[in-house]
């Protein structure tokens, strides 16, 4: 019986179209028969489900995408799968929404988000460009059914970051779009890259976001994944997942990758810093 060998990172870039039909059908049947297959929660028909992405609501329908490697329960070539729901109990399956089939994401469609603006829905995600695994930030439009107009909008700057560069988060303030992307600096410190743009699909580099505590820049591990930011009650709230973080408190940051939130003054977009953030272990 044919079976892919995923040891030593073999066969991690298999596409649905590459898999023998018999194999694909068999692993789906095996998954369906699993007595522990989730009843209420979203789960893939086979393979590996990674981050939920691009969450948005359109006319009372909630759209959920997630990263999917169909060939097996290991990390491999990521596609985006699409589901919808009205009540988060019953789900409608729409199949693969995004294949890794453009120049900008041919080696994987990774973490992203959706920004709803009136009738428009902008989607931002990390694409892996080639076999050298070079990351970039990509853009797509979502019309409620399909993701279209996919393209690269920001390139990784190899003079500033390592290959750890991913997870765009975008918001709009007044008439300008702002994007945060998590990264590892060349000095192996966790940093947030800030970009600005007049259009949702066009950005220029603005600088690194500094997290100032008592006038000193706070360091959080060697990489900051999945940044998320919003403002409320004259405060700026930043979420991120630091890699390589430690603490003198034996109860802090005991997950493999923890999540933290910081509450401080709103992000100063001219000086590019968040001042006096408090830091708490979130998970």
State each model region's role.
Residues 2-62, 68:
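N-terminal regions that are enriched for targeting/export leaders
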Residues 46-49, 102-109, 159-165, 216-222:
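Short glycine-/Asp-/Thr-/Trp-enriched loop segments that recur within the blades
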Residues 51-72, 94-96, 110-130, 136-140, ...:
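Hydrophobic core segments of beta-strands in well-ordered, beta-rich domains
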Residues 77-82, 88-117:
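Blade-loop segments of beta-propeller domains
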Residues 81-85, 136-144, 192-199, 254-267:
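Beta-propeller blade signature
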Residues 89-93, 144-152, 200-207, 268-272:
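Beta-strand initiation motifs
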Residues 178, 189, 203-244, 252-266, ...:
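Catalytic cores of carbohydrate-active enzymes
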Residues 272-283:
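Single conserved hydrophobic/aromatic residue that forms the stacking wall/gate
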